[in-house]
Every structure is written in structure tokens, then in C-alpha cells.
From Swiss-Prot:
Glycans are attached at T96, N152, N219, N483. Belongs to the peptidase S1 family. The single chain, almost fully active enzyme, can be further processed into a two-chain fully active form by a cleavage after Arg-310 catalyzed by plasmin, tissue kallikrein or factor Xa. Differential cell-specific N-linked glycosylation gives rise to two glycoforms, type I (glycosylated at Asn-219) and type II (not glycosylated at Asn-219). The single chain type I glycoform is less readily converted into the two-chain form by plasmin, and the two-chain type I glycoform has a lower activity than the two-chain type II glycoform in the presence of fibrin. GO terms for cellular component: apical part of cell; cell surface; cytoplasm; extracellular exosome; extracellular region; extracellular space; glutamatergic synapse; Schaffer collateral - CA1 synapse. It comes from the Eukaryota. It catalyses: Specific cleavage of Arg-|-Val bond in plasminogen to form plasmin. It is found in: Secreted, Extracellular space. Residues 42-52 are annotated as: Important for binding to annexin A2. This is Tissue-type plasminogen activator. It comes from Homo sapiens. The gene is PLAT. Residues 311-561 form the Peptidase S1 domain. It is linked to Increased activity of TPA results in increased fibrinolysis of fibrin blood clots that is associated with excessive bleeding. Defective release of TPA results in hypofibrinolysis that can lead to thrombosis or embolism. The active site is at H357 (charge relay system), D406 (charge relay system), S513 (charge relay system). Disulfide bonds join C41-C71, C69-C78, C86-C97, C91-C108, C110-C119, C127-C208, C148-C190, C179-C203, C215-C296, C236-C278, C267-C291, C299-C430, C342-C358, C350-C419, C444-C519, C476-C492, C509-C537.
Length: 562
């Protein structure tokens, strides 16, 4: 690792995307999907790609000449062409525009700090503001660590957002693979190639408000806090220390300011390592160590995809939209193999919340299995995580008649202090603050693998989601639920849309028990209820009943303590 730190070199893009020389071209074949290949030309410095027979202009370094190039069998063929000043402004941020004399191609010569076809890329931007809609920086890594795909890639031609859109420049898209937020999502994202297909994923781009916090997001590349101790307790050396002469990452690095290095000894991650680190002296020997900087919570954040298929009782969903959803399976004494039992909710790396009534058969813990990251109920997912159960705790005052105190905790089994590993399909939900009171009729979401309707003999083959509204307490009473007991430990939610007997109203159903009812609070999905019971499924003016999580925060914390 120490040798890697000496050898790595981080290069920021400080010049226009078209400043290349023939020796910088890479002739490559790009894998497309899982079957075919397509010959392209790629610029090594800027990652700009060009399809077969595509043409472009480029300035020649240290020269006033401009070349006309085209991509031929993976090789750029170029020759000089006469140019003139553009008849209309086409370059942003003070770029100088030149147009070919005999055809319409143009090239922008960008001032320092900007790049791109139209100088629209801000190479000095290290974080994003608000939702990142105006972010034009050069971050190109997804939260999973996957490298973003160039927006101009032919593999994205059929995607709703690509560099080929007429409004691509306005949206920040183009011949690059940098994170953007063209659809006004919650933060910048990009397309990545995973599991044999291209899909969207949030980027690990830091928010500007995160940079100076006392914790780090992702791998901590954007961490700008003041921690200066390593995991062993050693003090970090200043990045401008004379002892570091000859090292790559010091205050003398040409990109030091952008990398967060300077006349200080604060922990940083300039080379994209797993987490922030620093140089230290141990036994009079210069080495490096990871820092004792805590990771920031990412609970309740997700890569939400709009469901495409409406089915009875809700909508088919992808697990990345509900990464805290767990599937609990059990071995029954009287039947071979495992059977789906209930839903669950990931609230920390090693703990799952569920409903107490799911465990009335008093299964031995080793008969239970918890699966995270699975979209299809019985089909293994490529990124799923599977765990045995160390123990489970059912609330001592659970009433199996009224379902009061319908809550349980499952501890996942692990050889270390961590169990579930965070990814785009596995992430904790936020527990609510004790005083959380959302307005009546707030729209919330539930998810699960339960039945489409009450009389169906089968559970859903795929994860579903449903959209319901929180009922006021005056409508969550016994008289609204056929005189069934309703306690202060319960809350109600249902689909309030109008419609006749055939209306497809959203609701939880058998098999969804133990799953989450989540609502947006302070920009994060927050757990307000655990799916508990109801009268049928999807009946008009009949809400579902959920365990009120705010009543059990102390119980949860007490039982999670070692």
C-alpha cells in the first residue's frame, strides 16, 4: 500500500477538453452490454469519446494551429484547417471561440479552471450546492465506487438523459463522464455498468455543507475537517513537513489546494483510498495510517427509480428504491427448505426491525435467515447480502390478540463488529426523532413482498411499493376498524384516492408484515411505522394499521446495547 501511495498521481483537468496530441490517443474497444463491441476513439486526458466516422476540431498544444479530426477504425486522423472567430458566442466562462472557415465545426479555448466542448466544466468545483442541479465539476465516481459512463456513450442512446439530447449543454451533459443532476433528483448521479447492464446510481460527490463536518461521506475524498489523529492514536505530520520531501501527496503537490493539502496536519484522502489517512512517524520510520475519523450517516438516502409497472395493491419496485427492506426466511419444522416469512427493516449494520407477530411459532434463531438487497422474493440478487440470525427479541408485552406492541428486533450474525455492508441496494433507514409529528395526510411509502390481494394464494414474486397517507388519530379508532382494538402504540395509513369497488387502492397485505412505513423528513426517508395488521387489503376508507415507532425508541436502543 505504501508503494502505491508513492506511485499514484492524481491529475486534475485544468485545460480544455480538446487540448490533445496524437500521442495521447487510446485506440480501444468498448464493451457494450454483454455481447457486442464498438470501435471508438478516446482522449486519454479528458475521457472524451468519438464514434466511428465522427469528426471534431482541436487546437494543437503550444501552437496557434487548429486540426480537423475524424475517428477512423479506432484511430484519429487529423490535419490542419483554417479557422476564423465565431460569428456568435458559443463558449461559456470566458472561452474563446474559433470556427472552421469552410464548415460549421467550432472549438473553444478555455481559460484556466474550465474545460469541455464549450468551457462549461468547472474543474475547480469540489462539491455541490443544494441538489447539485448546477454542479459542473469533474467528480466521476458513483456511491458504489463504480466509474461513471461517458454521457455520449452509444450505450446510453436510449436512456432519457444522454449527451445527445438537444438541451445537453444546458443540463451539463456532454462528452464526459462527470456526475450531473439533469432531472432535479436529490443529488448528482450518473450511469454505471453493473451486472451486465447500464443503470443510474447516485454519485459520491460531496455536498458543500459536508466538507467541513466532523465525519466523512463515501471514501472521504471531500473531507475537509480537522481530525488529526490516526486509528492507533498517532499524530499526523503536517502535509508541508520537510520529512515528506519525495512523497507524492504533500503541500507541494501541484493540485494540493484542490486535494485539501496545505500547512496543516488534518486527515485527508487525496488518492481516493478507502478513507482519510495521513503520514506519521512510527519508531523513527516514516509511514502512513488511516485516521480515526467517523463515517457520516447515510441513513434514509437512496437511488429512487420511478416504478414502471402498476399491479394490484401497488407498484413493482426495485430494491435500490427501498434499500432498507429485508426479507426474512424461516425453516419450518414440518416442511423442508426455507420459506418466506415476513419483511424486515435494516436500522443498523447488524440489526433488523420487524413485527412481533411474525415470530409466534418461536423459531430457533438458527432457523432464520435475513436477506438484504433482493428485488425478487425468491431469486437471488447479484448484490444481495445474506445473514444468519444471532438472536431475536420479541417485545415482552406483545399481545397476540390485539397486536399491541407488535415489534421485534433481530441481531444478524457476524464474525466482526459489522454485518451489512452499505451499497446502493443495502442501506439503513433513519429512525425518527422522539418528537416527530408529521401533519395529517402526509404521503408516505410502504414496501414488501406480500400478496397482491387478500384472497391471492401467492406472495408477490417481486418487491412492491405503495403510497399511502397518514390518517389523523380521530380516524384511527376502533369504530373505523370494525371494533378491533386500536391502542396509542398504533397509527393508521391508507390510500385516500376516490374510486369505485374496482379501484386499485394501495395498501399492505399478507406477507408485508414487519416491513417499513417510511416518510420523508429533513430530506431523508424516516421510519414511522412497522406493517402490523389490517382488515383485508386495499379497501376504500379502511386504513392499514402500523406499529408507531416513536413509542419504541428507548426499547430499540436498550435492546441493541451490547
Amino acid at each position: 500500500m505504501d508503494a502505491m501511495k508513492r506511485g499514484l498521481c492524481c491529475v486534475l483537468l485544468l485545460c480544455g477538453a480538446v487540448f490533445v496530441s496524437p500521442s495521447q490517443e487510446i485506440h480501444a474497444r468498448f464493451r457494450r452490454g454483454a455481447r457486442s463491441y464498438q470501435v471508438i476513439c478516446r482522449d486519454e486526458k479528458t475521457q472524451m469519446i468519438y464514434q466511428q466516422h465522427q469528426s471534431w476540431l482541436r487546437p494543437v498544444l503550444r501552437s496557434n494551429r487548429v486540426e480537423y479530426c475524424w475517428c477512423n477504425s479506432g484511430r484519429a486522423q487529423c490535419h490542419s484547417v483554417p479557422v476564423k472567430s465565431c460569428s456568435e458566442p458559443r463558449c461559456f466562462n470566458g472561452g474563446t471561440c474559433q470556427q472552421a472557415l469552410y464548415f460549421s465545426d467550432f472549438v473553444c479555448q478555455c481559460p484556466e479552471g474550465f474545460a469541455g466542448k464549450c468551457c462549461e466544466i468547472d474543474t475547480r468545483a469540489t462539491c455541490y450546492e443544494d441538489q447539485g442541479i448546477s454542479y459542473r465539476g469533474t467528480w466521476s465516481t458513483a456511491e458504489s465506487g463504480a466509474e461513471c459512463t461517458n454521457w455520449n456513450s452509444s450505450a446510453l442512446a436510449q436512456k432519457p438523459y444522454s449527451g445527445r439530447r438537444p438541451d445537453a449543454i444546458r443540463l451539463g451533459l456532454g462528452n464526459h463522464n462527470y456526475c450531473r443532476n439533469p432531472d432535479r433528483d436529490s443529488k448528482p448521479w450518473c450511469y454505471v455498468f453493473k451486472a451486465g447492464k447500464y443503470s443510474s446510481e447516485f454519485c459520491s460527490t460531496p455536498a458543500c455543507s459536508e466538507g467541513n463536518s466532523d465525519c466523512y461521506f463515501g471514501n472521504g475524498s471531500a473531507y475537509r475537517g480537522t481530525h488529526s489523529l490516526t486509528e492507533s492514536g498517532a499524530s499526523c505530520l503536517p502535509w508541508n513537513s520537510m520529512i515528506l520531501i519525495g512523497k507524492v501527496y504533500t503541500a507541494q503537490n501541484p493540485s494540493a489546494q484542490a486535494l485539501g493539502l496545505g500547512k496543516h496536519n488534518y486527515c485527508r484522502n487525496p488518492d481516493g483510498d478507502a478513507k482519510p489517512w495521513c503520514h506519521v512517524l512510527k519508531n523513527r520510520r516514516l509511514t502512513w495510517e488511516y485516521c480515526d475519523v467517523p463515517s457520516c450517516s447515510t441513513c434514509g438516502l437512496r437511488q429512487y427509480s420511478q416504478p414502471q409497472f402498476r399491479i394490484k395493491g401497488g407498484l413493482f419496485a426495485d430494491i435500490a428504491s427501498h434499500p432498507w427492506q429485508a426479507a426474512i426466511f424461516a425453516k419450518h419444522r414440518r416442511s423442508p427448505g426455507e420459506r418466506f416469512l415476513c419483511g424486515g427493516i435494516l436500522i443498523s449494520s447488524c440489526w433488523i426491525l420487524s413485527a412481533a407477530h411474525c415470530f409466534q411459532e418461536r423459531f430457533p434463531p438458527h432457523h432464520l435467515t435475513v436477506i438484504l438487497g433482493r428485488t425478487y422474493r425468491v431469486v437471488p440478487g447479484e448484490e444481495e447480502q445474506k445473514f444468519e440470525v444471532e438472536k431475536y427479541i420479541v417485545h415482552k408485552e406483545f399481545d397476540d390478540d390485539t397486536y399491541d406492541n407488535d415489534i421485534a428486533l433481530l441481531q444478524l450474525k457476524s464474525d466482526s463488529s459489522r454485518c451489512a455492508q452499505e451499497s446502493s441496494v443495502v442501506r439503513t433507514v433513519c429512525l425518527p426523532p422522539a418528537d416527530l409529528q408529521l401533519p395529517d395526510w402526509t404521503e408516505c411509502e410502504l414496501s414488501g413482498y406480500g400478496k397482491h390481494e387478500a384472497l391471492s394464494p401467492f406472495y408477490s414474486e417481486r418487491l412492491k411499493e405503495a403510497h399511502v397517507r397518514l390518517y389523523p388519530s380521530s380516524r384511527c379508532t376502533s369504530q373505523h376498524l370494525l371494533n378491533r382494538t386500536v391502542t396509542d402504540n398504533m397509527l393508521c395509513a391508507g390510500d385516500t384516492r376516490s374510486g369505485g369497488p374496482q379501484a386499485n387502492l394501495h395498501d399492505a397485505c399478507q406477507g408485508d408484515s414487519g416491513g417499513p412505513l417510511v416518510c420523508l423528513n429533513d430530506g431523508r426517508m424516516t421510519l414511522v411505522g412497522i406493517i402490523s395488521w389490517g382488515l383485508g387489503c386495499g379497501q376504500k376508507d379502511v386504513p392499514g394499521v402500523y406499529t408507531k415507532v416513536t413509542n419504541y425508541l428507548d426499547w430499540i436502543r436498550d435492546n441493541m446495547r451490547p
